[in-house]
Amino acid sequence: MKIPSAAFAELTKIVGKENLLTDEVSLSVYAYDCSLSRTRPDALIHLRQAEVIAPVLKVLHAYHIPFVPRASATNHAGSCAALNGGIILNVAPLNKILQINTQEGFAWVEPGVTGGDLQDALAPLGFFYAPDPASERVCSLSGNLAQNASGARCMKYGGTIDHILEIDFVLPDGTEIHLSRKDGGPDFIGLIAGSEGTLGVIKQLKVRILPVAKHIKTFLVTFPSLSDSVQTVSDLAAEGIIPRCVEAMDDVTTRAVEEFAHAGYPLDAKALLILELDGTPAEISEQEKQLEDICLKNHSLKFLPAKTEAERQKLWFGRRAAYAAMARLAPNVMVGDGTVPRSELPRALEKVRRILDEQHIYASLLFHAGDGNFHPQIIFDERNRPDTVRVTKALKEVLQACVDCGGTVSGEHGVGVEKRAVMAYQYDKPTLDLFVQIKHAFDPDHLANPLKLIPVNYAEKAREQAPLSAATKQLAEKILLRKKVHAPCLITGENSRLKTKGANALSTQTLNRILEIDKTNYTVTAEAGVTLKNLARALTQAGVYSILPNGKGTLGGAFCSGCLPSFYAQVLGIEALLPDGSLVRYGGKLMKNAAGYHLTRLFAGSQGTLGLVTRLTFKIYAKPVPAAPEKPFVRENGHLLWASIKKQLDPGDLFPILAGEKNV
């Protein structure tokens, strides 16, 4: 696109001419990321002061100039490609660690700070930042949030989404907002996680930091087949064992790593696991015996504990070097990023291997196995067009196989442009429509990283919607009727928190089934009207536990009321009826999902103002866990973003925001 000279003049005043570049070399350097996408921007701005972000966006908004936020550009999905031209906003120079507070457990950082920089600053203080993508030495913390990247420790500690406490954020029109986990209403930090720069620009982040465990023990375990190794992971999950890390790799990976990094991986096995435990010596000793027994049951060849810290670090250096090791073998590496329920790993592996063999593709297989996330690393030469087409086709088939196994097309690498089309494998039309509405609420002019994440012309390609249950169908009909006659209503369960005061209530009491307690994946799926008492009774009978209190109210109320914010991170899947009567579905039994906007976080704490949650899938545990602390219920005033999204979803105010109602 042609950028008006007046816009250049205004931008130059803000950032200085040395930071606004249009020369061919600069634009070529910023025309690509780690994907195959190559698109030349019209200009490049180096952002060296956080205070200029909002003024820059105001100018871009005034002149309707699209922009792409960019830091280290380590993503594999084309998220940094400037598809509509416009301006690349390089936040990498904003790389200061502003504050570290070990007493309260947080750090404030600028968006260009890398994970490695933060870890180096924390280590002498005896602290660490839990998310650990393999590229943490170079990838930025804002990029991690934008992609919801996770890494090896996700199984125990969760992904980036779970470790961001506050952010300063700039909307595409230049409006600055501050978001905190203490805010009432929907979890907007969670919604921004994984949004790939399509909703605005991250200015600063406050991240959670944790004390380094005093005792950590790492094991290298070898197997005669990759199937045996991933079955081990499924069995660990089924036993409720949660190691600090569980990484798997095949012999193609180990050979490449040994030639490059000399990590000490045995070459006489078809697969290996890196398992890591932390805790007290007694806890580690108990779990070590369980680990070894499960590994032996699955035909392990060697069970080797790291004897020194140097040996432990060497094992992890090899794992982090896997991508670079494969990149030495060919001009290009295409990295897949599917996630399936942990119990489905063996079946997914079988499907993936069949696809790669049928296409005669040479690839390594690498897994964040503890959370069902795997990365086929396919080597090829993009200058060979038939080869590139074949590889791209195979990877799409791999992602379809993930969806067929109840999984997602992205666990942590995002969607960008390269996986945009396959979103239709995973989501039906109403859910994709909701993604569009979320984008429009934040960015009505579609200037922020346009044409990413959401498929183009998806109406006929979207996944067919599964049938609605009888109770859900009845509620959908009631919603449509009330919309038709303009009869606003309040969504209620047991009326334990909200006094309806004679208002037209819409009850979830007919949604009262516990649909599945899955002790293989350690998840439960239940309808929103199930009472917490009945749920607690059923879990106790099944010998499993959740963080939900055994008190008044329903599952849907616990999730939507805002009284149990620590429960949000436990929720993996959701179904909800929107104010137009359509049903949206997101997630499932997945420990990771970076495909699309996080709808679980949109409805969390939304107090029934955006739609009626019909069912949830959430984590359970093999051992007792502390109950979530409960806050008093107060009807919240609508946050700027809350009001904007509500206007998109519910323009007729069918489910009103009523501030000031007290707990009952």
Regions found by a protein language model. Give the residues of each.
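C-terminal substrate-recognition/cap domain of FAD-linked oxidoreductases
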Residues: 21-30, 207, 211, 217-394, ...
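Glycine-rich N-terminal segment of FAD-binding domains in flavoprotein oxidoreductases
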Residues: 25, 32-94, 368-369, 469-517, ...
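Alpha-helix capping/hinge segments and adjacent helical runs
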Residues: 17, 403-415, 444-448, 651-654
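FAD-binding subdomain of flavoenzyme oxidoreductases
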Residues: 96-100, 107-247, 448, 463-467, ...
